[in-house]
Amino acid sequence: MHTFTRKVKWPFMFTAIGLTFGIVAVACAQPTASTVEGLFKPSSAFADRTDFSLSSILQKSLINRESFNQYLAMRLAPVLRTFYEDNYDTDIKERLNGFTADTDNAFVSQEQNLRNQFRENYLVHLQTDIFDNTGGNQAAWKLRDVNNKIIDDFISRIFAKNFVEYVQDGVGPLTKPTKSLIENTSNFKNIKLQPKFVNKNAKLKINNDAVYAAIQDKLLDQFITNENPNLVSRVVFTNETPVDGFDNYFNTKVIQSPTPSYQFQVFNKYNQQSGGTKGANGFNLLASNLKSYKNDQSKGIDIPNKFSSDSGGKLLLKASDMFDTFDPSFSAAFIQGYLALQKKSKGADSKEVDSLIKDKSIIENFFVDNNTQAAAAARAASSSSEGTIQLKTASDGGGTTQSTVHKTDLVKIFGDKDVFAGEYKQQIGNTNANQTGGGGSGGGGGTSTGSSTGSSTETTTGNSSKAVVDLIEVKKDSSSQPDYILSRGKDGIHLMAVDGGSHYLTESGRDVAKQKKFLLFRALQTKYGLVDTDTTYDFKLFDEVKKYFDTNRILFLFEALLDLSSDTNNKDNFLSYPQFKKFADSIKSIEKDLKELVQAHYKQAVFNETAVAENKVTLKLAERNQPFIDNERNNQIEQNGLAAKLPYEQDAKTGHYNDLGNYYKDIIDNVDKKGTSTVKTTSSNTGQTKNFSEEVVSKLKDNKKKVEEAAKKHVEALKVFTIPSPLYSQVILVQTKLSFTPESTSLGLNLALNNYLTSTELQNSIKLSYFQEDEAFKKIIDITNLTFSQQSGGTGGTNGNNNLTADNWKIFKETYLLDLFESQAQKSIFGHVGSSDKNSSTKTGIEGVLDTLYSSLNLEERLDSDDVIDYLSYLYTAHWLLKDNLKNYKQSLQSKLSRTSNAFLVWSVDSEKNKNDSQSTLSSTASSTSNTGLIQLRSVVSLAQNQAAGQGGDNNSDITQTEVKNPNFVFGSSVYDWTNSKTPEVNRAADDTSSFFYTKSSSSSTGAAQSSATVLRSLNQASGMTTKTAKNRYGFRGIVTSSTSGSLPEAVSRRLFKQFVNQTEKGVKVGGQMLITTAKSGKATLVLKQQADDAESTTNNAYKGALFSFGSMDNLKNIINGIQTQTEFDALYNHLTSDLNIDVTGVDKNKTLTEQKTSLTSFVDSNFKQSTQSAQRGDTSARSARSATVQIKKTQEDNQNTNYKDVFSRFDGYIGDNKVEEKNYTSYQFLSDGGKYHATFVKQVNLDDVEKIGTDSLKQEDSSKDKRLNLSLEEFLAAIALEALDPNNQTQAINALISGNKKGLVKVGDFRIFSSISAQWVRRF
């Protein structure tokens, strides 16, 4: 090994001798003491925990994809080196010497840069910055650099030539095959990747091409199997501006200035006289000759480019990127055609070629019968959902199968919006016709009309009404499978076909070998120019193979070499050439060592990438639908025009499109066959075929175990040991002597370690160990399976959680998932809130969606992921808040709550209903006169009877206790039902998905609506109403203070903290105008009066709770007395007068601070003295003493303190335009804000409530409610669950977790670990 001083070149020294002497002087200098002392001293162990042993860390390194690729590259390079060392091409052989020279020069340059930068300390930095990361010393650095150069050069040679040829038996590759010869499926077997000039028995440099061609062939196999590439022959007819004007198709008074687009898709009519090959005339010619475009010999389909508005030709659609590259409607339409050839397609309308409409406008093919007798009969027979019809389609056995056709009924969707005109009105029907059950109001944005399940086909406009479809399968005749797809897209109408699909796609599946041969046939055609001029296309097959290969080139190349080595069917590949014996032997040697591990990694990589690709289907289709949903949300549904749903059905539970997933299932099933004789595709417990999303998860889990087992076996076989660290080194280095090339193998292991030890996976393993070592936390959750113990917690001692059950802890899990769900851009990809089959155990409601979200995270298989650490950090924070009799939760609240500002437990949701305009309550009836008394009475009695029957209308049902299954189109439109999965009815205005957060309340003591009026309660009781079970309350926001109210709608926040008492409420006088009396018969009569003494129906709650935060008058006075500055006084004074609207009198701001305080105290004494006496009213005794007849009492006399009598009392109830207690919901008026209506329920809390939290707070008994903020246990835990999401609480909890670890901080012995993770988690040995 040369030292650095010998690297200086003599010419350089002679021309710059002064500089050279300086360098020598620096080289001889010793590093500074401070630099050396600051170095990390490596240990013999990575960390002082069991899972951080040498064997364990090496195994994890070889399981990690990136680390394994680092290792694999160093194992691959020595194999490829043998190809260079004995090569008969001198240029290739000399490349090795060039690589070595280039590496030596690169090292000299790098060394010089470090000298110039760090002077006397450069040797330290050479070791720590360079060598420590690349194997430990100069030799390892150079070996790595040369190895990488070998790999890069070899790969560049693989794809340098196009080797596809027609190989005639007994002749070899033809110079140029004929068109007729290759266009025959029986000759496809002769199309191969083979060099034209090779001689197996001679040692020639041209024989290198045999190596490149053979590897190309194996990489092509990978590409075909893993990407499922299909050529699509296609033409497009782009959207047109109609010559007769858009106003002959769309009502331009409703849709102003329509332009050519998908929504306003128009095509000019066929004109026999005009000629031409574009537009309608071109479609006429194309459709008339469609049967002739399929070549019965080659099975290829070539559509003349002249018909296309663009250049036409063919496109290669691949699994990994087609939904990123193309319009998702186009990609999905291709899959529909792919599946149709396998007899697996569903949902689309079907036409025979001869029935295509050719002599009118192209788009008329997409207007289909909407209400024919056949469709109605099919619906009745199949009990199909609205928006679908059942058609008979032929099957192989001569029988018939039912196929649901999804179509869009625009007549019903647009309701009274007159969207269409002229031609389209004639076809589609009159959208503003007076229909039975049809049509929402124009201002309603197309709300559902009689059905919330989808776009119904049932209208009363007669058989002339047409529905719209987006895709049509086109087949030659009734007995054949569809060869073509006619589909609508953003740019126009596409006619497409899977080129050659009928050759390799059958009912039994995809024949990968035939698919490969067909694509080679097309590649051969383009190579030799054997394509007809009118159907030319651009197809560079091996550019696509190279593009795929580059995504994981080390693993894919290694897998290709192993496949060649084990390919017993091909005796003529390069491995049998005498001149490549050394190369072949090296492949064989490494095959035994690495095959199991490489193939396990290979499958895992493909399964992962395919799962990612399939997820894009759901995401991209959701993005496709989103603009149309937004139009509906924004009351601009007419802007959707002709937009129609696609024919694919989304699984409401999982969010996946299972039918489209069959395309991806063809990939993983074929990959799984590698190395096995059979492939399992059915569920072991049901015997039913699994869909893709289920199967890929199963395969990933099973194969992950194979990767782990193979890595463990491989590490054990290598007998790896640590070696002394070089001078100045800060890392642990390893070595093995048991391998084909021990130097490169040892280097590979060190590179794998270098990558893994700085990875997030390693950091998370350290963090995970803290959770695993916390004994109290382990009693709550099984960290391996992430499941809760049935009895989670101790006895309430130091670490106990008062025996919370697993069900209690699920509240925390669901809260975490709801928070995560809210952050998702496309929430519909996780399914939606719907009803399950009555015989199914599937969860309904938001819980089902959260289950899908949780399953998608696959946490149990990713314990070293950020997702798991985030989840465990949250759960530990909840545990930390609960432990020690909720000491930390109590302290957290005490730091947030203040005596001088109110705090609330808040439930707030939005409503699409303006309840304020349509009240049928006592409060609205009370102002009427006696002349309308009978009408008023009937209205009240009817309302009471509805409530007694549990049938209260939207305006009278507590929407905070109503599950909103689709707030503001989160899961799509129920009118369109874009996903054909019965999207729940939309609650339009509720666009804040926090409405999904809910709590379980205690059992209620009265009926569903819990009316505030005596008569309504009496009627409910007379109707046999019984005590109801606990109901959920939605829109839970936890404890909200003025400083944490940002998550609330602005209007709600302002009402709570700036307008708790508003001007309108201040003007309300106590009293009413009517009284309702019930006789024993149950009949009601109306009695007028001046004042009623029934406080429950007429109490003015304006100031109730205004000063609840202070707790009592004494506390308020003490705070006033304790004020030290004018600023403090002004803050309190402004809070009372501005925020709470209290008319404070007698305070002169021009006087001294002491005088102002005295005046304010006097005002408190004068006005609030009754507060403590009126804080609790005897509601229960009043109700029990009340007779069936409400008696008229004298008007109460006003007194100056009446408004303030409950000022220190707790307010629990609804707050909006007015404030009413919980029992008085029917008189509640929503808070309006910009066209939205907020329903908000609150419970006040103060520091006195917080002080009571402690020993008995987590007991189930209601007697403990006053020790948990007057909440049920479920509500209380939900409040704590939200507090556990607080980043500040999480920081404190994790600090406690770390400081409380009995083993102390994790000791680490490698600088790479120490520097990659926060110092709070680790320390040096």
From Swiss-Prot:
Biased composition (Gly residues): 436-448
Disulfide bonds: none
Lipidation (S-diacylglycerol cysteine): C28
Membrane spanning residue stretches: none
Domain of life: Bacteria
InterPro entries found in the cross-reference section: DUF3713 (IPR022186)
Residues with a covalently attached lipid (N-palmitoyl cysteine): C28
Biased composition (Low complexity): 449-464
Family matches, as Pfam families: DUF3713
Stretch list, region Disordered: 379-402, 430-464
Membrane topology, record value: Lipid-anchor
PROSITE patterns xrefs: PROKAR_LIPOPROTEIN
The entry's keywords: Cell membrane, Lipoprotein, Membrane, Palmitate, Signal
Residues of the signal peptide: 1-27
Subcellular location per the Swiss-Prot or TrEMBL entry: Cell membrane
Family: Belongs to the MG307/MG309/MG338 family.
Name of this chain's protein: Uncharacterized lipoprotein MG309 homolog
Organism annotation: Mycoplasma pneumoniae (strain ATCC 29342 / M129 / Subtype 1)
